[in-house]
């Protein structure tokens, strides 16, 4: 009983203690639970933060890996493997352009291959360009009658046939990317840049893709888009390089290929065009810009959304205010552009009013290398090799033999470097410009003559103290007595030619003017000269076209009319015949008929001079007749001309003179000129305003025996000493 009571008391005591202190116990429990909850919350938060950091690090690593992967793929992706530059050149211009372009492309880090079309077989190789990822550039010139240069003939022939051969298929060159730059002269209007246009068209017909519009370089400085063919090429080259940079970056907006004529016109503005906006702004002054505003167009499958254009024409009400704002902004920009356009049109009109200079930097460089001293913007003077020869007492030119000029006192010049022909035998290297009328800036005749004499005298002064130069002839050479207007070009094209001639005669300088028989009206209006030449390079229409390569479509009628105009002249007139073996030596009867038209006082017959190998001409030494052949031709021609005889010979120049019998006075030839008498007659003509006329027989002089045909000297002046060169290289230039 006591034990159970004690146990109960013990339990009761403790329970009562707990009951009495229950508030303390609750507080401790609450504090403990709070501490546990707080610690658990803190631990959970830290764990979450750690997981977030880990996940973020993993995400960054994943993104970095993805970025590296994309970069690696991009680096491995090749958009342009290289550039192949094809050139077809006759005179070397397009070849030179090809090398210039290659240098610029190399700077972009791309491999470049220069390909002469003559050495390339398109049948075996061209199809490879459809998968090569190369850009093929074609620089090709247009030659005579719209034909390609000899080096590009086979390539063009194959390409034309392939584009029209169903066996190749219309997608034969699909995937090939190309650009074309054509070289031509707009003076030849019917054939201007024909070859470049055809190559572009034929490639397009075979589904090749243009990377930019076809461009055209113009040798005619008057109509050239940028003033010269060199400037045209430079402008195109800048555009091409910008286009190439865009292609390198992976742009996929080539020309759609739907522009059949090679003149791409974008309907929508692509992102690549921003690369070229600066160049296009610079060229808004050009008269051709309206036909070639863009260098390429967007592909046909491009979506409107790519250019920021909505797919629907509807506008939400919420966007109406923004739309109105954009419309006002567009109107302001349009008004601003309109004013700018008017200003540019005014500047363009002003530019059109100001003619361009004939001499371009490239022409200046070429002629200077050939020994020309250029005057102003269209004239030049050069020291003839016969002038140098006679200063040394080594003999004069054929004019000295035939007409008695003093070769060391003869100035060879021209007031017009331009010509209306591109003769195959021209020894001026075909560097001079061509044209059918005067459209360049014009210098005054007083300035031209003053500068011509000054430059001629300066060139003579360079011979002071040179071994072999005769002192008396050196002093005489400083005083110009004769002027050969036969240097280069067509002097009669110069609008102030009559004024120039009067200035010459006022200074007692005789005038020997040469024309190419393409300007009959100018011949009729020409004032008297000491001697007027007409080049008669062929006697039939076909051979004249082949040899002279004239610009005029009616060249033959102009030729005939020029000869008829020559017959009306009262002063000394000369036919100049240049014999080219296998070209024009078998046309004796036709030559005789031409003599009957012009009734010249004299006929000079000269064998063509071989000027060395030239890309502009296919003449060789085989085309140069021997002197004996020239003599035989002259004798056979005289047999058909009852009023003419062979008068003089200059063996050194491979030249013969046929003279009208009226110059054989009292049995003696009088082909020489009394220069003092001519000056008296021309002064009287001028003072009388043309009423006191005179004829060729009024200023003749006796021809010395050594100058006559059949003499022992064969036209070499015995007062001089014949000089034989040790080597065969010689200067072939001369009047």
Curated annotation (Swiss-Prot):
Residues 403-649 form the Radical SAM core domain. [4Fe-4S] cluster binds at residues 419, 423, 426. It comes from the Eukaryota. Residues 83-241 form the Flavodoxin-like domain. It is an enzyme of class 4 (lyase). Pfam families: Flavodoxin_1, Radical_SAM, Wyosine_form. Probable component of the wybutosine biosynthesis pathway. Wybutosine is a hyper modified guanosine with a tricyclic base found at the 3'-position adjacent to the anticodon of eukaryotic phenylalanine tRNA. Catalyzes the condensation of N-methylguanine with 2 carbon atoms from pyruvate to form the tricyclic 4-demethylwyosine, an intermediate in wybutosine biosynthesis. PANTHER family: S-ADENOSYL-L-METHIONINE-DEPENDENT TRNA 4-DEMETHYLWYOSINE SYNTHASE, S-ADENOSYL-L-METHIONINE-DEPENDENT TRNA 4-DEMETHYLWYOSINE SYNTHASE TYW1-RELATED. This is S-adenosyl-L-methionine-dependent tRNA 4-demethylwyosine synthase TYW1. It comes from Xenopus laevis (African clawed frog). The gene is tyw1.
């Amino acid at each position: 009983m006591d034990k159970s009571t004690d146990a109960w008391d013990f339990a009761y005591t403790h329970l009562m203690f707990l009951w009495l202190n229950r508030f303390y116990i609750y507080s401790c429990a609450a504090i403990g639970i709070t501490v546990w909850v707080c610690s658990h919350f803190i631990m959970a938060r830290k764990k979450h933060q750690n997981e977030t950091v880990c996940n973020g690090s993993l995400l960054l690593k994943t993104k970095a890996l993805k970025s590296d992967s994309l970069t690696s793929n991009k680096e491995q992706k090749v958009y342009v493997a290289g550039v192949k530059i094809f050139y077809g050149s006759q005179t070397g211009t397009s070849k030179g352009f090809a090398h210039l372009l290659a240098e610029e492309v190399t700077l972009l880090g791309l491999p470049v291959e220069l390909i002469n079309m003559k050495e390339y077989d398109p049948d075996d190789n061209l199809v490879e360009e459809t998968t090569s990822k190369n850009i093929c550039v074609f620089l090709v010139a247009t030659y005579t009658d719209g034909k390609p240069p000899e080096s590009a003939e086979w390539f063009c022939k194959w390409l034309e046939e392939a584009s029209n051969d169903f066996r190749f298929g219309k997608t034969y060159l699909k995937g090939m990317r190309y650009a074309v730059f054509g070289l031509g002269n707009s003076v030849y209007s019917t054939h201007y840049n024909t070859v470049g246009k055809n190559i572009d068209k034929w490639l397009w017909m075979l589904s090749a893709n243009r990377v930019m519009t076809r461009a055209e370089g113009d040798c005619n400085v008057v109509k050239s888009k940028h003033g010269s063919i060199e400037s045209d090429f430079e402008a195109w080259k800048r555009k091409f390089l910008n286009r190439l940079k865009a292609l390198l970056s992976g742009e996929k907006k080539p020309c759609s290929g739907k522009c059949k004529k090679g003149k791409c016109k974008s309907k929508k503005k692509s992102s690549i065009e921003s690369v070229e906006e600066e160049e296009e702004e610079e060229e808004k002054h050009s008269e051709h810009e309206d036909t070639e505003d863009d260098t390429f167009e967007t592909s046909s499958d491009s979506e409107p959304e790519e250019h920021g254009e909505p797919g629907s024409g509807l506008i939400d009400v919420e966007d109406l205010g923004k739309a109105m704002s954009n419309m006002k902004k567009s109107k302001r920009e349009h008004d601003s552009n309109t004013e700018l356009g008017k200003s540019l049109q005014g500047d363009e009109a002003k530019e059109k009013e100001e003619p361009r200079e004939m001499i371009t930097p490239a022409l200046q460089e070429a002629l200077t290398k050939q020994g020309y001293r250029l005057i102003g913007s269209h004239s030049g003077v050069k020291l003839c090799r016969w002038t140098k020869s006679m200063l040394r007492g080594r003999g004069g030119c054929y004019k000295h033999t035939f007409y008695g000029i003093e070769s060391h006192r003869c100035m060879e010049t021209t007031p017009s470097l331009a010509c209306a022909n591109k003769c195959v035998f021209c020894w001026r290297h075909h560097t001079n410009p061509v044209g059918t009328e005067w459209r360049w800036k014009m210098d005054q005749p007083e300035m031209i003559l003053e500068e011509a004499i000054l430059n001629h005298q300066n060139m003579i002064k360079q011979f002071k103290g040179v071994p072999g130069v005769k002192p008396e002839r050196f002093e005489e050479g400083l005083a110009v007595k004769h002027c050969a207007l036969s240097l280069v070009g067509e002097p009669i094209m110069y609008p102030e030619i009559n004024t120039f001639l009067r200035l010459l005669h006022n200074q007692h300088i005789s005038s020997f003017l040469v024309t190419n028989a393409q300007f009959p009206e100018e011949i009729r209006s020409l004032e008297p000269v000491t001697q007027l030449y007409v080049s008669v390079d062929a006697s039939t229409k076909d051979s004249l076209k082949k040899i002279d390569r004239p610009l005029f479509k009616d060249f033959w009628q102009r030729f005939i009319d020029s000869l008829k105009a020559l017959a009306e002249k009262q002063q000394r007139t000369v036919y100049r015949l240049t014999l080219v073996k296998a070209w024009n030596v078998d046309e004796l009867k036709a030559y005789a008929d031409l003599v009957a038209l012009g009734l010249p006082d004299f006929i000079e017959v000269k064998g063509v001079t071989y000027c060395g190998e030239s890309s502009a001409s296919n003449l060789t030494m085989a085309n140069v007749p021997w002197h004996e052949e020239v003599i035989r031709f002259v004798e056979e021609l005289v047999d058909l001309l009852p009023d003419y005889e062979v008068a003089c010979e200059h063996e050194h120049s491979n030249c013969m003179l046929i003279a009208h019998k009226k110059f054989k006075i009292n049995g003696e030839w009088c082909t020489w000129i009394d220069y003092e008498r001519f000056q008296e007659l021309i002064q009287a003509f001028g003072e009388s305003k043309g009423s006191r006329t005179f004829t060729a027989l009024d200023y003749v002089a006796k021809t010395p025996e050594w100058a006559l045909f059949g003499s022992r000297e064969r036209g070499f002046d015995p007062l001089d000493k014949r000089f034989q060169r040790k080597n065969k290289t010689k200067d072939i230039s001369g009047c």
